[in-house]
Regions:
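N-terminal, active-site-proximal structural segment of metallo-dependent hydrolase catalytic domains
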Residues: 2, 6-7, 14, 21-93, ...
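Metal-dependent phosphoester-hydrolase catalytic domains
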Residues: 26-28, 127, 198-208, 215-304
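An acidic-aromatic substrate-binding cleft motif
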Residues: 41, 550-629
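Acidic/histidine-rich helix-loop elements
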Residues: 42-61, 139-154, 180
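Structured beta-strand-rich core segments of catalytic domains in phosphoester-bond hydrolases
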Residues: 79-171, 277-278
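Polysaccharide-binding surfaces and accessory modules of carbohydrate-active proteins
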Residues: 306-311, 316-317, 329, 334-384, ...
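Active-site-proximal substrate-binding groove within the catalytic cores of carbohydrate-active enzymes
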Residues: 539-545, 735, 775-963, 975-985
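Active-site-adjacent "subsite" loops/lids of carbohydrate-active enzymes
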Residues: 665, 669-742
Length: 989
């Protein structure tokens, strides 16, 4: 091929930029080497003979020179460099402090020489030297001066060069082009450009393609280029400026919607696009050209001999292999290795003919680089079943003080597809020590001794999932899952997984065991997070929320990691004192769904109140108080005129609260009875959710009388409201106002403190239907509005909701526990310790079965008691065993309320208990002067008497109360089965 002589026009001033780096030893490990930082870009200068008036060459050339110097590019492609520019512009740039050499290629010269309608590779001479230069034309005969296809009016082409960084000796390959306007010409020229890049860069040096390519991201020629290079706009860590690059010399151009036709592509291991800039700066209020300069700050590192990169500090280290695998995830303090060198992501997409098509990284080609404390893995192209897809994946792994952050960016350019799911990071074949137990925040918290056995259980509906491949535990944040984290907790160390995502988008906690094909056993553990981008062609999705922390110490360290993140968005007001002092409530249905009266308004201040007082309970959670009855007629809630209507109810509430009680008034926050006046008015169908076919989503509640007809055939049917719909908000506001006007001390909205696992709202207007994956955020916004409406007007007017998801309960004064959690894996310690300020109840104790154990759990964990006898059909007096034991428990709570009710839950910290068989917790009073230690014998099986000695350093025992046959002698507690004792310690003076 012909080579042109290098023509240099030098300037004297030096502009210090991110391109100059001192030399370094190539023998050093990659993490210790000096990186090469370089700014590479493109700038179409616009022919000097085209502009008029203020855009004439004589008036804009100074602006253009200033723009070149101000951008400070180390290397850039200049397009439309005509003879007048070539004669004047370099000197103008020099005079303003530039120091550039301009290597031009004119497609109108047989040798490519000269400056007639030329393009140029421009580089700083104090930073780089040019080692070679090549050029070719856009035609069927690219080595001859020619034009081709449907663009014969102009001659087009490309030029390329190898540049050596003077300080470090590193070499890079740069190709510059001004693509044709003709569609056919662009489509044919793109593969020529790729082929010549391969030919002229046989060593596969870091490679860059820059220029005005006269195309769009979604066009086929761009897809061809992305088969070889990566588009820095799609892959850069940071984007500055506008999406559009062509301003059409009009300051009124909407640059965010203007065409993006100027591109900076890159390729190569060790190359990181840190910052993409479209510079829209104006000079004297005008653009210097009809294109904006575009440049990218790159960091280039040498690739280590084994192709892997490692980041480490004193706490944690992570290593990524040359194939993008997670080679190591290590606790540096203990030496525990958790990774096994497996891949760390999966992707699923839909096409028009198939759904949930799996993409695995093991069959992809990756590019890996490191910059500072961040490793980046690029996948410029995705392959599935031998077919290439125009989708890009970027993974950024960075090290923080106590954790590793796993960020990701997805770009979909494949027509008629949507990226549905991205599973990342994945810790496959996890190396878990035998003492590590699996923690999830399901129902407030569960702890499983054997992760493999727990996850490996076959589902209740076998093989609906491909359980011949893996077994999975379904854990979705917000859907009965209180926190967006889980962990593997050992005695002295553990592994914390957190999705620190303040968008509160749908997130699954990936808990799987895969089948080992060599043994047939399901014992290959995998942990991670699953997100749902729904990324259509032409869209980018990003997430930087997911972290993994190999921590040292007890699980309280992991709790601190989560709480530190929570504090960045937590917005919980001071809870009304009456709520904090509430020990229990009676939850009672007055009129049931099918019309039966269980209680009347007159009973509120009669047997209902008397029953509550018998156990020290002064709160009533009132259900079914309206004419239609419980779970019927929502959201009409018609006054029950047969009992005197709202006036009679208001009078009964006033009398109840005058006796020192508190009434909590119930509404459902989302269900719309399809027989209600609200629904039949036409509004209901407008505000309700729709599924992936556009049909209404329905829920049914199968309460029955004593026959079978209701439950089997005649259930009530409800539509489900869309949260944050303005009309539905107004409904909730009016219900809240009505509760306040009735004199209730609290309004409660059922089903607003969590999200459902399936019944989200779908948008069916796009090529593929899309679900709303931000249900938590919308519920949170709704609850915040409800809270704030009465925050100043009536600060003691409390707001409650069912469910205790952290992002939602921050706006509530209390929550009703959902779902019930009373099995052997119950372990709400983590949630309770992380959120000691939250007031929430238990659930599920409905009769006289297993009462002491259940009630003891609520005292140990600082929960309030939800008295829901016979699922709210009865009152506590109907269950004498429960009544008797709860009376003892509430007396203890009242006696030690400064610690148990108003103090801070402190778990097992601050004291010692000599017997690990005894369940023990501590609560510290607000003044820090007293600590209550709760101890209980919760051992099931054959009854045994056990004892423990409790010591609190710097404190002395001053008081104690017990249930059952428990005894306290000194600091020793002796406990029969399901006995409990509370021991109060006071700080020694």
């Amino acid at each position: 091929m012909n080579r042109s002589a290098i023509v240099s026009i030098l300037s004297t001033a030096i502009l210090l930029l991110a391109g100059s780096s001192p030399s370094y030893s190539k023998e050093l490990p990659a993490t210790e080497e000096q990186a090469l930082d370089v700014r590479i870009g493109t700038f179409n200068l616009w022919r000097s003979d085209m502009g008029k008036d203020e855009y004439s060459w004589e008036r804009r050339r100074d602006r253009l020179a200033r723009a070149i110097v101000d951008c400070g590019m180390d290397v850039f492609a200049a397009e439309e460099v005509d003879t007048a520019m070539f004669r004047q512009l370099p000197a103008l740039v020099e005079a303003k402090g530039g120091n550039y050499s301009w290597q031009t290629f004119s497609p109108y010269d047989a040798e490519g020489k000269g400056s007639v309608k030329a393009q140029a590779i421009v580089y700083k001479t104090d930073v780089f030297e040019m080692l070679d230069f090549h050029r070719f034309w856009c035609s069927e005969t690219p080595d001859k001066m020619s034009a081709g296809w449907d663009d014969v009016k102009f001659k087009r082409g490309a030029c390329c060069a190898t540049l050596r960084h003077k300080a470090s000796g590193k070499r890079i390959f740069v190709m510059a082009s001004h693509f044709p306007l003709g569609k056919e010409a662009r489509l044919h020229f793109a593969p020529i450009v790729v082929a010549r890049a391969k030919e002229y860069n046989p060593e596969n040096l870091p490679s860059f393609l820059v220029g005005d390519l006269n195309t769009r991201q979604e066009r086929p020629e761009s897809a061809i280029l992305r088969e070889w290079w990566s588009d820095s706009y799609l892959m850069a860590w940071e984007k500055v400026g506008t999406r559009g690059t062509f301003n059409n010399h009009d300051v009124g151009t909407d640059m965010d919607n203007a065409p993006r036709i100027d591109f900076v592509y890159f390729r190569g291991n060790g190359v990181t696009p840190r910052r993409y800039v479209c510079n829209t700066v104006k000079y004297e209020g005008l653009y210097p050209s009809d294109h904006c300069p575009v440049y990218v700050d790159f960091t280039i590192n040498d690739v280590p001999q084994d192709g892997s990169y490692r980041l480490a500090n004193e706490n944690v280290s992570v290593k990524i292999g040359k194939d993008g695998a997670l080679v190591s995830l290590r606790n540096e303090r203990t030496g525990q290795e958790y990774a096994a060198g497996e891949y760390m992501w999966r992707l699923y997409y839909d096409s028009t003919s198939e759904k949930e098509i799996q993409v695995l990284p093991s069959v992809q080609n990756s590019q890996i680089s490191v910059c500072g404390d961040r490793i980046s893995v690029f996948y410029p192209r995705i392959s599935v079943g031998g077919k290439n897809l125009d989708m890009q994946v970027r993974l950024d792994i960075s090290l923080e003080e106590d954790k590793v952050r796993f960020a990701s960016s997805l770009c979909n350019n494949e027509p008629h597809t949507v990226i549905r799911e991205f599973q990342y990071p994945l810790l496959r074949d996890a190396r878990i020590p035998s003492d590590h137990k699996l923690y999830t925040s399901e129902a407030g918290g569960m702890l499983f001794d054997d992760p493999v056995k727990t996850i490996g259980k076959i589902s209740s509906s076998p093989y609906k999932k491909p359980e011949q491949v893996f077994r999975q535990r379904n854990v979705k944040y917000g859907s009965k899952v209180f926190m967006n984290c889980f962990g593997l907790f050992g005695e002295r160390q553990g592994l914390y997984f957190g999705s620190h995502d303040d968008t509160f988008q749908d997130t699954w906690h990936g808990l799987r065991v895969y089948r080992d094909e060599s043994t047939g056993k399901y014992d290959i553990l995998e942990f991670g997070f699953y997100k749902y981008p729904h990324c259509f062609c032409g869209e980018i999705w990003e997430c930087a929320a997911n972290v993994i922390a190999p921590y040292s110490g007890t699980w309280h360290t992991a709790s601190g990691i989560y709480r530190n993140w929570v504090n960045t968005w937590w917005d919980h007001r001071e809870t009304p004192s009456w709520v904090r002092e509430m020990k229990s409530w009676q939850r009672v249905i007055f009129k049931h769904q099918y019309g039966e009266y269980l209680f009347k308004y007159a009973d509120l201040n009669g047997k209902v109140d008397a029953s509550g007082q018998s156990v020290g309970c002064n709160a009533l959670f009132l259900f079914g108080w309206w004419a239609e009855g419980m779970d019927h007629g929502n959201p009409d809630y018609s006054p029950d005129e047969s009992q005197g209507g709202d006036e009679a109810l208001k009078k009964a509430i006033a009398e109840y609260q005058a006796n020192g009680n508190h009434l909590l008034l119930y509404y459902n926050g989302k269900l719309i009875d399809r027989e209600s006046r609200f629904y039949r008015s036409g509004i209901g169908s407008k505000v309700c959710r729709h599924d992936n076919t556009g049909s209404e989503i329905l829920e049914r509640y199968k309460f029955t009388g004593q026959g079978t007809w209701l439950g089997e055939y005649d259930q009530r049917t409800f539509a489900v409201a869309t949260m944050m719909d303005p009309e539905w908000n107004n409904v909730l506001f009016s219900l809240q106002d009505r509760a306040y006007d009735l004199g209730a001390q609290s309004v409660f909205f059922d089903q607003l403190g969590y999200i459902e696992s399936e019944s989200t709202n779908w948008d069916t207007s796009r090529e593929f239907p899309v679900p709303d994956t931000y249900g938590i955020r919308k519920r949170a916004e709704c609850l915040r509005l409800l809270r704030d409406r009465y925050a100043e007007k009536a600060p003691d007017f409390a707001l409650g909701a069912e469910g205790t998801v952290d992002a939602l309960c921050q706006y509530c004064d209390y929550t009703h526990g959902y779902p019930a959690n009373d099995g052997p894996e119950r372990w709400i310690n983590f949630f309770r310790f992380t959120f000691p300020e939250i007031v929430f109840t238990d659930r599920g104790q409905r009769d006289d079965e297993d009462v002491p154990r259940h009630v003891n759990n609520t005292i140990l964990d600082g929960q309030r008691n939800d008295i829901e006898i016979w699922r709210c059909r009865g009152i506590i007096a109907d269950t004498p065993v429960y009544q008797a034991y709860l009376a003892q428990a509430n007396a203890i709570k009242e006696h030690f309320k400064d610690c148990l009710m108003l103090g801070r839950y402190n778990d097992t910290l601050g004291f010692s208990s000599s017997n690990p068989e005894v369940d023990a917790r501590s609560f510290v009073a607000e003044d820090g002067e007293r600590m209550a230690v709760v101890v209980a014998n919760q051992q099931t099986g054959k009854p045994r008497v056990i004892s423990t000695k409790v010591e609190v350093s710097g404190y002395r025992l001053v008081d104690a109360m017990m249930t059952g046959s428990a005894k306290v002698s000194g600091t020793k507690a002796t406990l029969g089965q399901f006995d409990l004792a509370v021991m109060l310690f006071e700080k020694q003076k």
